[in-house]
Regions:
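DNA polymerase processivity clamps
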Residues: 1-115
């Protein structure tokens, strides 16, 4: 699967959603469907935070989890307006690419997220 997402929107949404997650893992769940990326995080004491952003994606809905800190670390250094996420399934490594600079490539491992 391949997703195109606005980098700044993704960063802002991740910061909002991860604001309540635990300091150690900072888990965030990405629910991907046609045209929409829904980000979720929760903490037992505080509840759940959900945010949605528009994306370029045409395919079957699926979900994948990540450590939000790792995602933010990659997104902050990319110097393009949009980024591309590529992965095979919810447990395979995800490749993050710039849509402008073909030399930029980062790989991030998913996190099993259940709630």
């Amino acid at each position: 699967m391949e997703i195109i997402v606005n980098r700044e929107s993704f960063i802002n949404s991740l910061r909002i959603v991860s604001s309540i997650s635990s300091e150690k893992l900072r888990p965030v769940k990405l629910l991907i469907s046609q045209g929409v990326l829904k980000l979720e995080s929760e903490k037992a004491d505080y509840g759940e935070v959900v945010d949605e952003i528009e994306i370029g994606y045409e395919g079957d809905p699926f979900q994948i989890g990540f450590n939000s800190r790792y995602l933010l670390d990659v997104l902050i250094v990319i110097e393009s307006e949009d980024i591309k996420l590529e992965c095979k399934n919810s447990m395979s490594p995800t490749i993050i690419k710039s849509t402008v600079d073909e030399s930029f490539l980062s790989v991030i491992m998913p996190l099993r997220v259940e709630w």
